[in-house]
Amino acid sequence: MPTVLIVEDDPINIRVFTKILTKRGNFEVLCSEDVEDILAIAASGKTDAIVMDVSLTNSVYEGKSVDGIRITQILKSNEATKHIPIVLVTAHAMQGDRESFLKTSGADGYISKPVIDHQAFVDQIKEMMA
């Protein structure tokens, strides 16, 4: 069964994403907002895709606060993890953000919160994993 790592700091969003991904997508789900943990999970091959919140309040890497854009850049610049599909999710979607976030981060997909079309969310992840 494919596994999706959810990188999110809001417990409600974690619950919602977990339910959508397990019920509709038949995925296993891992959750973390700890950067070292995220990098270790990705490098270990334990995840087939990542759902990455853009705005993370508690994530720190090398002593600095980092957001989902920066974590995605780190993952995409590493030979061992750059192949893992990453979908950015954000509640702060403004006109032009999608293209800007995708270009800056190197992520493979983007969806705004709240996730209204649950099946489209699952389908986007499945398509990237194919």
PLM region spans:
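Two-component/phosphorelay signaling modules centered on CheY-like receiver
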Residues: 11-36
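Short, conserved "switch-loop" micro-motifs in signal-transduction and mechanochemical regulators
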Residues: 78, 92-93, 116
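Conserved acidic carboxylate
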Residues: 8
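Helix N-cap/capping motif at the beta->alpha junctions
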Residues: 31-40, 65-68
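Alpha4 helix (beta4-alpha4-beta5 surface) of REC/receiver domains from two-component response regulators
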Residues: 62-66, 70, 93-111, 119-122
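Active-site beta3 strand of CheY-like receiver
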Residues: 45-58
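Short amphipathic alpha-helix used as the core "switch/output" element in two-component signaling
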Residues: 59-82
